[in-house]
Amino acid sequence: MPFGVTAQVFRALRWKLVLREGRLSVILNSIFLSYASSLVVPRSGEVLRCGVVRRYDGADFSRLVGSVVSERIIDMLMILLLTLSAVLWQIPVFVRFMQRTGLSLGSVLSRFTPAGWWVTALSGVLILCTALWLVWRVQLFSSVKARLRGFRDGLVCVKRVKSPSLFVLYSVAIWLSYYLHFWVAFQCFDFTASVSSDCALVAFVVGCFAVLVPTPNGAGPWHFAVKTVLMLYGVSADDGAVFALFVHTLQTLLVVLLGLYALAALSLTKIKIR
């Protein structure tokens, strides 16, 4: 559990560094609350945390959203680096995982016909051109333009951080904490503690992609992905299911407790007068 908390603390420190405004306590509580919110409505937490900082510290909402998007891009790059490292280190395991789950890039792309690709591409271009014309040419959308400028400022604010090295350090610390949180759970069971540390890394990486499925805290896809990886390393299906259920329940409990703490803390926090 401690590493699960430190991951969110480092995330708050990184967001504070990017925003250069707002109280750290408000930012941290907004992040705690965002994960709890996503348990109820998947992916709602990102908007909620922006709303919390907007309400309590008066920051521009569009800029907050832009900064969150830029943060998530950085997180995705971190996941891709972890994935590349794990794949290069454990290529045979990933091949067996794809075979066992029936996943492959070819099987996904084969579902699209040439006509389907053309229709999708042309529709996307048409929608984009229409939206740009409305936003930049029609006076009725002047307020939208202002919000887009705020969003753009938030999106590029990562490039303007005062300490890029500290930003990188926080980003590494976030994902190291996530991994250590997962690795500690590995040591709690005889059947996972006895397998190689490579298994923990592969299961962690695969789990990162499983939680992208819009279910509460990745419930379902995450269990299946982690259990499947454990089975590839010789853990029985029953033991793998027990491990996945235990870790996911622990994570969910932590998210709920931190969310309740954030609600209590924010109720005692003064709103800045704007």
Stretch-by-stretch model annotation:
Residues 33-42, 202-223:
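Transmembrane alpha-helix interface/packing and boundary motifs in multi-pass membrane proteins
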Residues 32-48, 55, 155:
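Short intracellular "coupling" helices and adjacent cytoplasmic loop segments at the cytosolic face
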Residues 1-32, 89-211, 250-274:
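Predominantly cytoplasmic-facing regulatory/coupling regions of multi-pass membrane proteins
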Residues 36-41, 65-88, 245-257:
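Membrane-embedded alpha-helical segments of transport systems
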